[in-house]
Regions:
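Extracellular and select intracellular beta-sandwich modules with Ser/Thr-enriched
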Residues: 1-5
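Surface-exposed repetitive/solenoidal architectures
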Residues: 9-177
Length: 177
């Protein structure tokens, strides 16, 4: 007599919600945002996952922010909806709220209200408050009020678009320096 058992291993996520469009993972605190950065930067797949901010988030307690999607092999590819909320005191010398954002990603309805991205003496490339680098992502109704510094590809919203212009930026604006 032989028996076969099938086991499905489901990773426990640190956020409330199920990550679907109807029940996105909820980002309510700085700790939740750090957990998202850690998750994507550990090469976890974010494609087809949905995240929604449920409150304004102050990153003032962090000495420096590590962007979500720290390099081109760790791109964020999900949907992040700020729902009109803001990020305050974002300080990063390696990108913006997001680092590398890839095909399939949508970043929407979020503002970086204050902070410093890059440094006044920086000659490095790729700085943007919402994302430093995009490869086919959509940015909708995002805004920036932080100071963004860089010597190469630097922008208030996105530092560079590396996909032949297939990314879209719609309804976004910059009031930062």
């Amino acid at each position: 007599l032989k028996a076969s058992v099938s086991i499905e291993v489901v990773e426990k996520m640190p956020w409330e919600g199920s990550g679907t469009q109807d029940d996105p993972y909820r980002i309510a605190t700085a700790e939740d945002l750090v957990a998202l950065s850690d998750y994507v930067n550990a090469k976890k797949v974010s494609k087809d996952l949905y995240f929604a901010m449920t409150a304004n988030i102050d990153l003032g307690e962090l000495s420096s922010w590590t962007p979500i999607g720290s390099n081109s092999s760790r791109q964020f590819q999900g949907t992040f909806d700020g729902q009109g909320h803001t990020i305050d005191n974002l300080r990063s010398v390696s990108g913006g709220l997001f680092g590398y954002v890839g095909v399939y990603a949508t970043i929407q309805n979020v503002g970086v209200a204050s902070g410093e991205i890059g440094s006044p003496n920086s000659y490095a490339s790729f700085f943007g408050a919402i994302a430093k680098w995009s490869n086919g992502a959509d940015f909708i109704n995002c805004w920036n009020g932080a100071d963004v510094y860089g010597g190469g590809y630097t922008g208030g919203i996105v530092g560079t678009i590396r996909d032949g212009g297939k990314s879209t930026i719609s309804g976004c604006y910059n009031v930062g320096n």
